[in-house]
């Protein structure tokens, strides 16, 4: 659960950090209506991607890193685009929220959330390689982790 602390701190900063002190409350991304609406659309897209990925996983889904009995390697739907689409959706929603709010607190929280997700996905990948050594290694060669064609 090493990934829990950074995401909790990052989530707290995003949710409440701009209320904690003047430096965290400083708006560094100017409020531009088009940018705010872009953030809203990105947030909705990230949420939709998370939901699609969650339903695609079906019974394989778990909130903690574990394999279930009869666990299958899912490589279709959003998993054909990225290996960790739920994290892609969450990061998209997080970045969108930072764009809309524009406060230092969100910008400080962003790397914490990214590090937390990165730690967790590395742990998941280790487990998947142990369970599906050949299949997952081939999947890793074909599909990027969280940003299609890039990362």
Stretches with model-predicted labels:
Residues 71-82, 86-87:
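Solvent-exposed interhelical
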């Amino acid at each position: 659960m090493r990934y829990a602390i950074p995401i909790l701190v990052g989530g707290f900063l995003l949710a409440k950090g701009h209320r904690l002190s003047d430096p965290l409350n400083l708006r560094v991304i100017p409020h531009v209506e088009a940018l705010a609406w872009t953030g809203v659309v990105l947030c909705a897209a990230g949420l939709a991607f998370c939901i699609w990925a969650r339903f695609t996983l079906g019974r394989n889904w778990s909130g903690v890193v574990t394999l279930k009995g009869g666990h299958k390697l899912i490589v279709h739907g959003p998993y054909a685009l990225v290996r960790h689409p739920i994290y892609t959706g969450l990061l998209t929603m997080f970045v969108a929220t930072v764009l809309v709010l524009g406060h230092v607190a969100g910008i400080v929280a962003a790397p914490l959330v990214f590090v937390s997700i990165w730690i967790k996905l590395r742990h998941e990948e280790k487990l998947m390689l142990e369970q599906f050594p050949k299949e997952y290694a081939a999947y890793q060669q074909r599909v990027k982790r969280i940003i299609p064609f890039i990362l």
